[in-house]
C-alpha cells in the first residue's frame, strides 16, 4: 500500500538518504541470450536526494510525501516495497514496518531515483534486523529488485559491469556539476528497444572492455579523471534522443555553458555537466533555470 501525504519523522524511526545515481559513462557490451543487456559504466552519486525513514513494525507499507509523491506509482510497482518483500522472502521473521518517503528526485529520469529509494530501504531493513550490507541475501534481493539497486546500496563511485552486479570502487574526487531533467519521463525499455540489439548480439569489441582501463588513483586531480571520462560515451544517448528529442536540447544547452564534460545519464532524460569550479556550476544552473523554468535543474557535486 502507498499513501500520499505528509511524512512526519518521529525520533524512533531510522532514516537514510537516497542519492541520485549518475552514469558518467555507459557502454552497452551486448544483449545476452536471456534478453538482459551487459553494461559497463562509471557511476557517481550526486548530492540531491530522496529521504526514506522506517518505523519498524510487523506490517509493511509506504507513505509517500514531498513534491514528487504522486509519481511513486502503484504499490505493486514500487521498488521500495518490492525490495522489502524480496528480502523478507530470504530472511526469516524479517522486521519491516512503515516506510515514509520524502520524494524529490524525478522518476524515469536515468538517475536511479526508484533504485536509490529501494537501496535505502534495504539499508534501513539491514539496520533494523542486524544484517550486514554485504549479506548474500541482501545482495540477491538488491539484484532482483533492479539492475541499478546493487550500486545504489553502496552509493559510492565505482565501475559497474555485467547487469549491475559487479562493482569496482573508484576514488573519484568531488566534481562540481549540474543535472538537468526536462520533466519528460523516459522508459528504459523504450530506449533499449530503439538501440535494437538482438539476443546474443555484441555491441562493442572485446578490446573495449572497461576492466582493462587503469583509472586514476585516489587523490588524483579532477583533470586526470576528466581526461579519462572524456574518452567514454553513453551508448544509450542516440537512441534516447530518438525516443525523446528534447534530450538533445538539454545537452546543447549544457554544452553552451562551457562545461568541461556534458553527457546523458543512464537511459535519460537527465543529463549532467561537470565544471571546473562550483561558481561556474551555479551560474550555469541559474542561466538554464531562467531560460527553461519548467525544467528540473540541480547544481551540486558528483562523487
UniProtKB/Swiss-Prot annotation:
Q: Which domain of life is it from?
A: Bacteria
Q: What class of enzyme is it?
A: transferase
What InterPro entries does this protein's entry cite?
GHMP_kinase_C_dom, GHMP_kinase_C_sf, GHMP_kinase_N_dom, IspE, Ribosomal_Su5_D2-typ_SF, Ribsml_uS5_D2-typ_fold_subgr
Q: What is its EC number?
A: 2.7.1.148
Keywords of this entry = ATP-binding, Isoprene biosynthesis, Kinase, Nucleotide-binding, Transferase
Keyword rRNA-binding applies? no
- Which residues are the active-site ones? 21, 148
GO molecular function terms noted in the UniProt entry: 4-(cytidine 5'-diphospho)-2-C-methyl-D-erythritol kinase activity; ATP binding
Catalytic activities: 4-CDP-2-C-methyl-D-erythritol + ATP = 4-CDP-2-C-methyl-D-erythritol 2-phosphate + ADP + H(+)
Cross-referenced Pfam families, in alphabetical order? GHMP_kinases_C, GHMP_kinases_N
Per the record, the pathway is: Isoprenoid biosynthesis; isopentenyl diphosphate biosynthesis via DXP pathway; isopentenyl diphosphate from 1-deoxy-D-xylulose 5-phosphate: step 3/6
Residues bound to ATP are: 106-116
Q: Does the keyword tRNA processing apply?
A: no
> Its Gene Ontology biological processes?
isopentenyl diphosphate biosynthetic process, methylerythritol 4-phosphate pathway; terpenoid biosynthetic process
Q: State the family it belongs to.
A: Belongs to the GHMP kinase family. IspE subfamily.
Q: What does this protein do?
A: Catalyzes the phosphorylation of the position 2 hydroxy group of 4-diphosphocytidyl-2C-methyl-D-erythritol.
Name of the protein this chain belongs to: 4-diphosphocytidyl-2-C-methyl-D-erythritol kinase
Amino acid at each position: 500500500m502507498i499513501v500520499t501525504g505528509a511524512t512526519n519523522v518521529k525520533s524512533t524511526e531510522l532514516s537514510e538518504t537516497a542519492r541520485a545515481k549518475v552514469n558518467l559513462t555507459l557502454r552497452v557490451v551486448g544483449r545476452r541470450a536471456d534478453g538482459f543487456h551487459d553494461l559497463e559504466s562509471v557511476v557517481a552519486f550526486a548530492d540531491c536526494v530522496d529521504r526514506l525513514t522506517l518505523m519498524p513494525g510487523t506490517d509493511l507499507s509506504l507513505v509517500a510525501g514531498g513534491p514528487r509523491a504522486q509519481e511513486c506509482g502503484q504499490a505493486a510497482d514500487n521498488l521500495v516495497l518490492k525490495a522489502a518483500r524480496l528480502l523478507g522472502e530470504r530472511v526469516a521473521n524479517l522486521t519491516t514496518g512503515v516506510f515514509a518517503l520524502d520524494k524529490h528526485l524525478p522518476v524515469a529520469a536515468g538517475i536511479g531515483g526508484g533504485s536509490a529509494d529501494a537501496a535505502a530501504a534495504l539499508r534501513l531493513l539491514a539496520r533494523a534486523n542486524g544484517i550486514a550490507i554485504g549479506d548474500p541475501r541482501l545482495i540477491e534481493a538488491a539484484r532482483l529488485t533492479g539492475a541499478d539497486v546493487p550500486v545504489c546500496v553502496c552509493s559510492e563511485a565505482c565501475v559497474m559491469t555485467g547487469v549491475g552486479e559487479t562493482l569496482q570502487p573508484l576514488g573519484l574526487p568531488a566534481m562540481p556539476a549540474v543535472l538537468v531533467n526536462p520533466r519528460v519521463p523516459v522508459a528504459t525499455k523504450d530506449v533499449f528497444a530503439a538501440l535494437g540489439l538482438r539476443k546474443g548480439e555484441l555491441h562493442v569489441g572485446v578490446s573495449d572492455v572497461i576492466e582493462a582501463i587503469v583509472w586514476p588513483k585516489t587523490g588524483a586531480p579532477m583533470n586526470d579523471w576528466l581526461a579519462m571520462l572524456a574518452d567514454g560515451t553513453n551508448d544509450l544517448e542516440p537512441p534516447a534522443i530518438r525516443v525523446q528529442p528534447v534530450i538533445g536540447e538539454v545537452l546543447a544547452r549544457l554544452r553552451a555553458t562551457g562545461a568541461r564534460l556534458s553527457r546523458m545519464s543512464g537511459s535519460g532524460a537527465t543529463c549532467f555537466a561537470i565544471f571546473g569550479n562550483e561558481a561556474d556550476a551555479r551560474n550555469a544552473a541559474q542561466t538554464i533555470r531562467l531560460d527553461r523554468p519548467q525544467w528540473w535543474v540541480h547544481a551540486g557535486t558528483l562523487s
